[in-house]
Amino acid sequence: MTSSYGHVLERQPALGGRLDSPGNLDTLQAKKNFSVSHLLDLEEAGDMVAAQADESVGEAGRSLLESPGLTSGSDTPQQDNDQLNSEEKKKRKQRRNRTTFNSSQLQALERVFERTHYPDAFVREDLARRVNLTEARVQVWFQNRRAKFRRNERAMLANKNASLLKSYSGDVTAVEQPIVPRPAPRPTDYLSWGTASPYSAMATYSATCANNSPAQGINMANSIANLRLKAKEYSLQRNQVPTVN
């Protein structure tokens, strides 16, 4: 026992000397430092890789979310529903509630419109109380009725102008049409000349002129001789009348 215990005690200083030696301390310290630094480096590297992976995943997710065509399926229907709801709300706000008038209300409104197209506030309020409507509804009805009245007036004026233009154009065309004269009856001589040749017509005309010229000369000579005889007889009669002393 003592020998074994002494051997153990002897080995302990030897081990202690080995551990306490400078070379062994440096080796152990180097191993320790190496292992810690290595672990730290691995941990830091793992943390950096994980961080980079998280950043890449986050950027990819953000790009996918920000892209208009690659939105998430859970968000797209919700956004579409929100947009539709907002548009429906806007349409509901813009849409006005139409008022339906009964026959008695329309008769009363038309009766007042025949009197005046622009009733004042007192008339509108009184009429609204009578027909069980608000003054704003009565005012809107008169605005719409005036617009309808103006449209009807413009349509009537356009139809009247169109009819006047049509009648005027018809009168102008009737005046501008020339009156065709009736064909005058043609004499037989003209027809005979038209049928005969020009040479024969000229020969006939010259022959008639030649035949008529001696007769005309004789007649003129006879008339001159008659005038001379009458003058002589008149002078003789004056000479034979006795003069009174």
UniProtKB/Swiss-Prot annotation:
Residues 94-153 bind DNA. Signal peptide: none annotated. GO terms for cellular component: cytosol; nucleoplasm; nucleus. PROSITE patterns: HOMEOBOX_1, HOMEOBOX_2, OAR. The modification N6-acetyllysine is found at residue 160. One of its GO terms (molecular function) is DNA-binding transcription activator activity, RNA polymerase II-specific. CDD domains: homeodomain (cd00086). Residues 69-84 have a biased composition (Polar residues). A motif (OAR) lies at residues 222-235. It is found in: Nucleus. It comes from the Eukaryota. The modification Phosphoserine is found at residues 21, 197. One of its GO terms (biological process) is embryonic limb morphogenesis. Keywords: Acetylation, Developmental protein, DNA-binding, Homeobox, Nucleus, Phosphoprotein. Interacts with SMAD3. Master transcription factor of stromal fibroblasts for myofibroblastic lineage progression. Orchestrates the functional drift of fibroblasts into myofibroblastic phenotype via TGF-beta signaling by remodeling a super-enhancer landscape. Through this function, plays an essential role in wound healing process. Acts as a transcriptional regulator of muscle creatine kinase (MCK) and so has a role in the establishment of diverse mesodermal muscle types. The protein binds to an A/T-rich element in the muscle creatine enhancer. Belongs to the paired homeobox family. This is Paired mesoderm homeobox protein 1. It comes from Mus musculus. The gene is Prrx1.
